[in-house]
Amino acid sequence: MYIGTFHSLCLRIIKEHLEFTRLKKNFRTLDAFDQSYTVFQNIYRFRAIKNFDTAVSNQGAWKQAGEICTLVNNLSEELIDPAVLMADADVRIAALGEILKVYQDILSENNLMDFSAIQTEAYWLLTNYPDVLAELRSKIRYIMIDEYQDTNYIQEQLVFLFGGEHKNICVVGDDDQGLYRFRGATIRNILEFPNKFDAGECKVIPLVINYRSNSDIVDFYNQWMVTTDGARFRFRWRKFRHDKTIEPHEKPALHSPAVVKLSSENDEDEWHEKILAFIQGLVSSGKLTDYNQIAFLFNSVKHQRVTKLARFLESNGINVYSPRSDMFFQRPEIRLIIGCLMLMFPKYVQGLENQEYQFLTPEHYRYYRGCIEDANKYLADPEAADFHNWIRRRGKLHFGLKEATDYGYSGLIYQMFEFSPFSDILSTEMNVGLVDLRPARNIAMITQVINKFEYLHRISVLDPATYQGRRRVDQNTETPCGNAAGGRAAMRKRIRALYLKLLYDGGISEYEDDAEYAPSGCVSFLTIHQSKGMEFPIVVVDSLGNIPRKNTSDLMETVESKYFKRPAFEPYTDMKFFDFWRLYYTAFSRAQNLLVLTCNEDRRTPSMYFREVYSELIDMESDKFDINEFTFSTVKDVNLKDTFSFTSHISVYETCAVQYKLYKELNFTPVRVSALLFGMLVHQTIEDIHKAALRHEESLITDDNITRWFDANYTSLSKSERSYLAEPQRRAALNQILRYAERQSASWDTIREAEVDISLVKSDYIIEGKIDLIKGEGDTVELVDFKSEKKPDIFKDRERIDRYQRQLQVYAHLVEERTGHKVSKMHLYYTGEDTGVPTISFPYQKNAVEATIQEFDDTVHKIMRKEFSQTAQSPKACAECDFRFYCGR
């Protein structure tokens, strides 16, 4: 059974058949920021396109990068060929085609794949390789898609590709909750779905009974969808909505209305106080058992009105969960860590004082100076004297740096963890609330940010070497924060200069836990889009001053009419109204027991589009509303099982539970060290050999082909890992692979599967593993795990071999439980063994496997109980650990 999003399933299909795609191994998938940053790094290539300014607005490079990403994503998901656009007589469309081509070239040159390309590449694979499609269809007999109203053109194409002749396709959705037009989604997919089949083939089952909401709430959002359907608002639903009325499951015996308003009149302070009184009244009445029963929904949580309300509530003891409100860079722990980093580079601080960095705005100068002031204030405390002295020593060292350090910026951050307050923050117990853990999670996030900067710009140490008249350490210190100047070479420098500035401007979302969408002890502040699929006992809807706005461009409308595979479905003039009503229908329908519409009323708020429904509501301060009549539901648990593997979880926890907590629970990013490129290269090329054997193409397993596969893997690996092997190392790796192929040449037919991802669902968690090779004849199989090293001494290295044996025993358990195959033996194959027997073999012993699985289970439950006090016993493990400064080892 395949379970996942369209993107996750497409990514799985791509990885399982990578050799047939246009990608190379070790491709990198871009998130939204990475995509924009990649375009930004190459903006000079786009600006060199003839008539570029007719397709993209004349603004700053970063905003142009974002606009380009929006355009190419839309075009890609509609399967538009850039050559077709480039041939158009309209210079705007021709330029747009060139933009798409340049963008696709950049992805290809750098072995990158963006979010949209995941689906387009899977579609290309399945339509160009019928055998792959046939294999997939033979595995998939039934398809069920939820939220079908939010699918786009390419997703519809994929659904019917998967479905094939079986046509066993079930889609579920609510056309009134179609919110993702800006991502290419179209409501037509669900409205026209029955038309894809012959008469009588498609059964439509209306789902109109609502089991979530109080009947007043159901009546309210039913009325919302029809009250504004008329000439007064200049649009009608017509065929663009299923004609339906949602029916409540039952009508509670309440006299008080379940839909009310809470407002002030042109007085923001009064509005804050009324909301505070509302929440405090719920608590004092005993009706509220947890703040997480309340959710505030906004069009945007980044608006100053929203962040001011959040700060007001938090200042009055009410914790607010608002991970997308762009508060990350304002959190005290982040300001302190940035300020301390800057103090360790006095030349950069001097530049700030002299306002030398032309690409920083006054807002950025204020922010960085504020961070430095916060750091100086903290360090002035006598209790911070050790930390202060350490920063002074580092600043002096970096100011007069003569030779490269053995650390970069990430390394400096980890060194700071020796001192308070960072050491105290990292010591926070994992069983406390989300707000208490937020500082630790934010510090973990800043390690991710700095680590990615170092990766993108190939920085691993602080280097005093001079380049173009300046020390590299000074150039690199300026690059994450802001400084650069004109020309193409300078543009590259400018790109690096703006990294942290761009993140600051765009905002970073704080930690979100998929297993706890409404954290206990917090009121939730969410966007309406973010709340989709959720439900809350009490929902407070703000943003009532909002109005319908056009979200399409004239250029894209022209392209759609000429080149999209099907004409526009909804009238362009009505789209903004459709989207507006669907958005707020979604907001109103999140409420279970009580729906509150709130605003600070003024001349424009509520807007004319809400005024009628809003004016008819009872004010919650009215005698007609009695909170004591209500019983509020509790927030439902999200039953998501965590996944554990032996190598990534159990082995790490057994080595050091503290390290496990910091890396696996809090998601700190390790300081980037040289990847184990040698081992990866050997493994990937052996995988190529095995795949050829599994395709019954043993004739391709020749020294020449192996060398070609090896070279291709080395090229993609060195590019993705940003590290390289000297010629003797490459030759040694290739010799290991050729030796393996020679030794196994007579037994390729025994291979059953290679690089097997396998998982097993237990009662409260999931075990997973990746098996290098499964081979065998008859009714039994043998498991093989490859090690790209010489065979160890079985006596001196007993502990390491035992750990590998336990890993194989876990794999044996997974294979037997999932496939029913009997495992007879398990092998460690050492490709570096050039003279003797390259394997260490273990017989399958049921009692030993069961004992290992019991140990695995015990360790998992320690992790689930948040038992993270045990530290490493091995001095070697501590010496190699990034957290050695924090632990004082």
Regions from the PLM with identified roles:
Residues 2, 28-39, 89-192, 203-217, ...:
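Conserved helicase NTPase motor core
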Residues 196-199, 257, 284-443, 447-451:
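ATPase/helicase motor core of nucleic-acid motors
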Residues 1-120, 167:
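A basic/glycine-biased coupling hinge at the interface between accessory DNA-binding modules
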Residues 376-381, 519-520, 563-618, 862-880:
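C-terminal accessory regions
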Residues 199-203, 209-318, 346, 376-389:
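Helicase P-loop NTPase motor core
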Residues 93, 112, 287, 384-530, ...:
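Accessory C-terminal helicase-associated subdomains
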Residues 758-852:
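Mg2+/Mn2+-dependent nuclease catalytic core
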Residues 2-12, 144-147, 172, 498-555, ...:
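Conserved helicase core region in the C-terminal RecA-like lobe
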